[in-house]
Every structure is written in structure tokens, then in C-alpha cells.
């Protein structure tokens, strides 16, 4: 979308210089949690005003430059447990320190301050945030990836990308419900 968080253009927070903040939301999928695991999907959502978009990279598409391209123009990126998982994983696998590129807020800690503990899906249920794939979890995401890789199962890839997209875009809903600026 042209004019929507344009690459290379930094946006000020709402009310500063009359520009609308460009919010970013990041979530990854991996083959597991160990240091030997691989990135399988990187999703970045962009929300500016009424415009919403989710870009995703998977498999060999995932490079430091490609992730930087998805983050370009975003004022602040939000994650859930990203400080401990997503961002260190990206740094280890791609050599990219996202926190040096864009301001980061981990919504998990905002949830904790409101006594909302547990993983993203647990918090979503407690806050009434809906999902199209309510029974999906991280274990199933790993299985879907291997079904795609080993069997060229395009339906498995489609479901995996939809699961990641829901994670990404529900971060926006979560941020708004928490009232985090």
C-alpha cells in the first residue's frame, strides 16, 4: 500500500507534528525452542490509522535484509514474549538486533502488570480476543512446517501462515485492550 508507513520515512507518535504513529507487530515461528532450531516464519503487521497489513516471510525468504525491509517505516514494534524469545532468536539466527533498529515494547510485561499471566493464547481467552484457529498451538506450527517441507503440503503452509498472521494481528487487538500507547 503506497503511503502506508512508507519505507525510509519515520513517523512521530500521534499528536507530534500532526503525524499518525505507525505501529508494528512481530511474531515468529520456529522448528523448536533450542539454539539449534530454525526460523520458519517471520510475520510483521503494520497498523496506521485504519490501514492494517501483515507481511510474512518463510523458509529461505527469511534474511536480515528482508526483515529490516518489513520493519522499515515502523515507529515501534510490539511483541508478546519477544524480549526473551522472538528478538533473541532473530539476533542469533540472522545477526539482526531488532532493538537497535526500532523501538520495542513487549506486551507480556504489560499483561503481567495487570495480573494477566500465561502465554498469548491464554491472555487472549481471558480478554475475549477471538481467533479463527483457536485450537492451534506452537507444537502444531512446528508439525505444519515439517509437513510443508517434507511433503510439499501447501495447505499446511497456508494454515501455518494464517496461524502466524493471527498471532501478529491479535497483538494489535491486545495492545488496544491494554491501552498501551
What do the PLM-derived regions correspond to, one by one?
Residues 35-38, 116:
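Short glycine/proline-enriched turns and hinge-like loops at secondary-structure junctions
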Residues 52-127:
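Conserved DEDDh/DEDDy metal-dependent 3′-5′ exonuclease domain
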Residues 128-181:
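Acidic, Mg2+-coordinating catalytic module of metal-dependent nucleases/exonucleases
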Residues 1-20:
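N-terminal accessory regions of nucleic-acid-interacting proteins
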Residues 37-49:
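Short conserved beta-strand segments at catalytic cores or DNA/RNA-binding microdomains
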Residues 21-31, 164:
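Two-metal-ion RNase H-like nuclease active-site motif
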Residues 33-34, 86-89, 172:
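Short catalytic/ligand-binding loop motif for oxyanion handling, primarily in non-cytosolic enzymes
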Residues 27-29, 86, 106, 167:
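Acidic active-site catalytic centers that drive phospho-/nucleotidyl reactions
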Amino acid at each position: 500500500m503506497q503511503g502506508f508507513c512508507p519505507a525510509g520515512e519515520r513517523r512521530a507518535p500521534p499528536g507530534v507534528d500532526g503525524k499518525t504513529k505507525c505501529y508494528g507487530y512481530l511474531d515468529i515461528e520456529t522448528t523448536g525452542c533450542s539454539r539449534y532450531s530454525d526460523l520458519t516464519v517471520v510475520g510483521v503487521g503494520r497498523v496506521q490509522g485504519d490501514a492494517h497489513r501483515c507481511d510474512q516471510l518463510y523458509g529461505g525468504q527469511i534474511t536480515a535484509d528482508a526483515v529490516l525491509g518489513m520493519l522499515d517505516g515502523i515507529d515501534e514494534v510490539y511483541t508478546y514474549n519477544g524480549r526473551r524469545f522472538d528478538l533473541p532468536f532473530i539476533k542469533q539466527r540472522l545477526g539482526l538486533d531488532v532493538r537497535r533498529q526500532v523501538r520495542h515494547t513487549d506486551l507480556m510485561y504489560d499483561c503481567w502488570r495487570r495480573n494477566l499471566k500465561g502465554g498469548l493464547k491464554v491472555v487472549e481467552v481471558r480478554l475475549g480476543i477471538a481467533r479463527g484457529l483457536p485450537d492451534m498451538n506452537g507444537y502444531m506450527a512446528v508439525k505444519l512446517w515439517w509437513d510443508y517441507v517434507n511433503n510439499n503440503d501447501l495447505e499446511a503452509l497456508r494454515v501455518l501462515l494464517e496461524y502466524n498472521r493471527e498471532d501478529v494481528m491479535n497483538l494489535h487487538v491486545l495492545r488496544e485492550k491494554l491501552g498501551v500507547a
